[in-house]
């Protein structure tokens, strides 16, 4: 049976004390590395060394700025004997971005770690070794400069989980929604205007009757 922990459901502004959006799958897989990732993991009894795979949806800070803390914790604090490096699955250019972010935050502290203990994977589809999951990555509608994508996560049982990343309504989501057992949408802004790069409460009405969960919330708790 698959386990999905919502360890953060807030948007970039962390409304009502919600931590930044992040999920943990089967206590081995993270989707994104928000700035609050270390306390988020500790709240559910995990640490950075518990994680075998990280999937990055896009480059915005509330999804990637936890990278320095995560890597630092994994190297020094929660280090354990591991047979394989951490696998980080992301789009081309992401290795340079996260490396620059991490080494800029902690110069010399991560020397050798990011090249030797992290395996950077740019494939659009992959099997997540050591888990019961595989994924297909697909483009979504968000700030283009952040190279936004979602993930169709495929469990060996046949269960399909559609993680839409940060996105407004788009063909990529609609084309895959029909084969998903659960759809995770972000609902990052209220109904106060036109926001093509986010779902609003009015937008998600179109998913009524489908198995949908929401994250990146701006609504009060």
What are these regions (language model features)?
Residues 80-82, 176-178, 205-211:
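Short, conserved loop/helix-junction motifs that constitute active-site signature segments
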Residues 83-147:
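Metallo-beta-lactamase
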Residues 173-188:
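A short alpha/beta connector and helix-capping loop motif
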Residues 36-87, 182:
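Active-site metal-binding motif and surrounding structural segment of the metallo-beta-lactamase
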Residues 196-205:
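Charged helix-capping and loop-helix junction motifs
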Residues 27, 51, 180, 209-211:
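Short, well-ordered alpha-helix to beta-strand connector turns
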Residues 215-221:
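Conserved small/polar residues in nucleotide/adenosyl-binding loops
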Residues 1-46, 119-175:
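Core dinuclear metal-dependent hydrolase active-site scaffold
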